[in-house]
A protein has these predicted regions:
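Sec-dependent signal peptide recognition
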Residues: 1-7
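Hydrophobic h-region of N-terminal signal peptides that target proteins for export
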Residues: 8-17
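Extracellular glycan-recognition regions
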Residues: 18-227
Length: 227
């Protein structure tokens, strides 16, 4: 009769041992952009039509679109890295203003081809990639989710629906994404929102700033090696 409690204790101990607790220290800067100059080092996927804008403006990257948009770093990342940036969702009467979808892709790869940059910006175009994805304030600012894509499955790792983990308008958020020794983590304003130890960790791939139907800005982006 005592086997079940002992088994549960053993399982709990195994889970605790598998938690992500070490994250290294930020080291060499691999890439940084303050978006004050020409838009270089990025590949942009979105519907190019009147009213849609993805460009550097007033010292920030501006994404002002009525559909999906992804701004990819034009080079892959490998190994233990930390990505940090400031991001704001603008709600101020603009035609695309909508409080939703502060999203990020990282460690993205296309299992079928070497060229990742073949998509239109529509969200469903990315379903067949392998990647990590965080969607803060998705579904009209009702959910915040961490997913792992792979083999055609968009596995839900964790989710929040409470107001503390949803978006506020016109606020600058410090977003930090880390990949370290088989774990990935998302922090917002210094608070850890998600950690995940991946049994099949994604160790290299592309990073993308992602949104759908909104007006957002990005600033002070830095990517560092984690030692």
């Amino acid at each position: 009769m005592r086997l079940l409690p002992l088994l549960l204790i053993a399982l709990a101990g195994a889970a605790q041992a598998d938690e992500c607790t070490a994250w290294g220290r930020p080291g060499a800067v691999l890439f940084q952009d303050d978006f004050s100059g020409p838009q270089t080092g990025w590949v942009v996927e979105y519907a190019r039509k009147p009213g849609n804008v993805v460009e550097n403006r007033d010292g920030r990257l501006l994404m002002d679109v009525d559909g999906g948009a992804t701004v990819w770093l034009d080079r892959p990342l490998t190994g233990n890295v930390q990505i940090s940036f400031m991001r704001r969702v603008i709600v101020d009467g603009g035609k695309n203003d909508r409080l939703s979808d502060l999203n990020v892709f990282w460690m993205a790869r296309d299992p079928k081809r070497a060229d990742l940059f073949t998509r239109s910006g529509k969200f469903e175009d990315y379903d067949d990639l392998t990647l990590y994805y965080v969607g803060i304030g998705g579904n009209r600012n009702t959910t915040t989710r961490l997913r792992r894509y792979g083999d055609g499955v968009r596995a839900l790792i964790a989710e929040y629906t409470d107001g503390a983990h949803l978006l506020a308008p016109n606020r600058d958020y410090r977003i930090e994404v880390a990949v370290y020794e088989g774990c990935t983590r998302v922090r917002v304003d210094g608070n850890t929102w998600f950690t995940y130890r991946d049994p099949r960790p994604l160790r290299s791939g592309w990073f993308g700033l992602r949104t759908t139907w909104s007006r957002q800005t990005v600033d002070d982006l830095k990517i560092q090696r984690l030692d």
